[in-house]
Amino acid sequence: MGRELVDKHMDKKANSLTASSTGSSDDNKVPSPSTNEAAEVKECTEQNLVADDARLRQQGITETPGSHKSSVKPRVTAKTTVPKPFSLSAEKPRRAAVDNNSLGNGASHNSSSASRVSQLNSPLPTRRIPDHKMHHDEEDSFSVASSSATSIRSFKPKITIGVAPTFSSTSRLERRREFYQKLEEKQKALEAEKRENEKRLKEEQEAVTKQLRKNMAYKANPVPSFYQEGPPPKQPLKKFPLTRPKSPNLNRRKSCSDTVNASYQEVKGKHCARHRHSVGGCKDEVKTNSVPRTPNSSSKDQMRKSKKGTPKSEEVHEMFNSGHDGETGENGVGVVEE
């Protein structure tokens, strides 16, 4: 039985070594999460085995080899009851029993323990990690290992040479200062030119105003000559003879001969144009003018004859008309001839 167990232990150890060797060879490749977890579980189990070996060495001195054999048997039987995922944790007591048997043999056990110590450079844990916390620790160790590996690969030492820093802002400040100085000079020159132009314009305006005042100063006499002269002589107005309208005859109509004689006697020396309606009056006047005049007695006799032929109403009317005959005054009112 002891030989078979040793053979089994060696086979498992060889498998574990091959797995570890393959894992180390594949470190350069990107490990998958399943392979990383398996490798971390193996490392934890190996660390636990080393701790168990040290503890069993101290106990193996006092115990006999028969007691080790009796302790190995129930652990071998317990192998069948343990589920497959926890095979690594079940193999721990089995390996411890095989190591105790090898302690009885002597040199073989020391050589195997030395090889294990040489393979594992990590410090020995004094406390066993519980199974329910193992997965969290594996994740933490995987993250730390991956971060350390990437940091080691990415870190490359560079040689830096001490050089004084050169800032572009200093050159910009100098250029800006020069620009502002030039701008201020231009502004000052423009202001000075503006002032000179204003002064020149004022002087020109003053000269123009003085010249205008000289030209506008008139030397006038105190009293003009036309005030001393008298008014011009007035020309006499020409007075034209005024015509007056003839009043209508409202009495009975006379015969043609009577009207002609009456009008001729009343108005002497008048133009016959005023009596246009009497055509025979002008002819009679011509005849009378052609006949030589007799003394006043003949004219009086004619007047008497004419008065006898006219009624009294006609006489009143003739007197009224004779009152309006004559020259008109300044206001156009007729003056009665005396």
Swiss-Prot record:
Q: What is the lineage of its organism?
A: Eukaryota, Viridiplantae, Streptophyta, Embryophyta, Tracheophyta
| Name of the protein in its database record | Protein WVD2-like 2
Source taxon at top rank: Eukaryota
**Keywords in alphabetical order:** Coiled coil, Cytoplasm, Cytoskeleton, Microtubule
UniProt record similarity statement: Belongs to the TPX2 family.
Which GO biological process categories is it annotated with?
A: microtubule cytoskeleton organization
Reported tissue expression: Expressed in seedlings.
Name the PANTHER family for this protein. Answer: PROTEIN WVD2-LIKE 2, PROTEIN WVD2-LIKE 3
Question: What compartments host this protein?
Answer: Cytoplasm, Cytoskeleton
Q: Name one Pfam family in it.
A: TPX2
Q: Where is this region: Disordered?
A: 1-150, 222-338
**Coiled-coil segments:** 177-214
Residue ranges, compositional bias (Polar residues): 15-37, 59-69, 288-300
